[in-house]
Swiss-Prot record:
Gene3D superfamilies in alphabetical order: 1.10.286.20, DNA helicase RuvA subunit, C-terminal domain (1.10.8.10), Elongation factor Ts, dimerisation domain (3.30.479.20)
UniProt keyword annotation of Protein biosynthesis present: yes
InterPro entries: EF-Ts_dimer_sf, Transl_elong_EFTs/EF1B, Transl_elong_EFTs/EF1B_dimer, Transl_elong_Ts_CS, UBA-like_sf
GO cellular component labels: cytoplasm
Source species of the chain: Campylobacter jejuni subsp. doylei (strain ATCC BAA-1458 / RM4099 / 269.97)
Described function: Associates with the EF-Tu.GDP complex and induces the exchange of GDP to GTP. It remains bound to the aminoacyl-tRNA.EF-Tu.GTP complex up to the GTP hydrolysis stage on the ribosome.
Name of the protein: Elongation factor Ts
Keyword Cytoplasm: yes
Entries under PROSITE patterns matching the protein: EF_TS_1, EF_TS_2
Domain of life: Bacteria
Matches recorded under HAMAP family: EF_Ts (MF_00050)
Swiss-Prot/TrEMBL keywords: Cytoplasm, Elongation factor, Protein biosynthesis
GO terms of molecular function: translation elongation factor activity
Amino acid sequence: MAEITAAMVKELRESTGAGMMDCKNALSETNGDFDKAVQLLREKGLGKAAKKADRLAAEGLVSVKVSDDFTSATVSEINSETDFVAKNDQFIALTKDTTAHIQNNSLQSVEELHSSTINGVKFEEYLKSQIATIGENLVVRRFATLKAGANGVVNGYIHTNGRVGVVIAAACDSAEVASKSRDLLRQICMHIAAMRPSYLSYEDLDMTFVENEYKALVAELEKENEERRRLKDPNKPEHKIPQFASRKQLSDAILKEAEEKIKEELKTQGKPEKIWDNIIPGKMNSFIADNSQLDSKFTLMGQFYVMDDKKTVEQVIAEKEKEFGGKIKIVEFICFEVGEGLEKKTEDFAAEVAAQL
């Protein structure tokens, strides 16, 4: 049995919002496995999904560079020790120059970057001189570049505070449609920066992930229903528990069965068959929406668009395809947040938490 420390309990509590004893018990039941403890709490309806932001620590900036012809988009992250330096004009210039250098030289790795030449000197030496001038340790943590294929287009967006950057690539069926899609892609990048989808579409979801999230979703809804039954508020009816959580689960057979049920309902209601074709599509869309809640939470195409929350990103793209007269397929997106995935430094809070256990 792994030792369950106060620090572990506090981290789990801050990540999930669950009670302290619930967190301690979850860690005990999962032998100290953080991710399994999160899942256990969620299946019991006691906590929310762990937020990536709860585990961010580093300071620094994310930078984005899009080529003038919209065929190459690069995003990079350079870390500093303090937020003060991250606002330094020289550091800001360093991040922009480095990102442009990466793109202009088609660099593929941090190691390749350090051995490259910039302004006549090795980048490694150039960075050391910047460190000496700025007065803090600086680290090029990561970068990535997306390239447009034939009739493709890329774009990017950097949030005003420089902590979040996004690049995106799309394939189109003509150069004209690709050119018209530039602004759309930038707006979708802004959506990604705000909503942080984890996947492109439901097709990218792992079935085990879907099944685990479905259990957590049902537990959460049942817990809310229990509270609504207790309050007996007529303005807050109970949630309908969905059969499924993602379009990944909606096979052709399941969709066919749902359609047949709708037809039976229409027949029972005495609706004439000649108007069924006008009713069935809307009811099928409602069925899919009710049973794909994970898609709207985790996937870009399934999320409601921040600039028009009555439409999904997928629907917005479909409308633009009609307007532009051609196909637009989002191929890939990359979103960097400063410090994402880095562990926090240990703080002196163990005694405070231990006193409550």
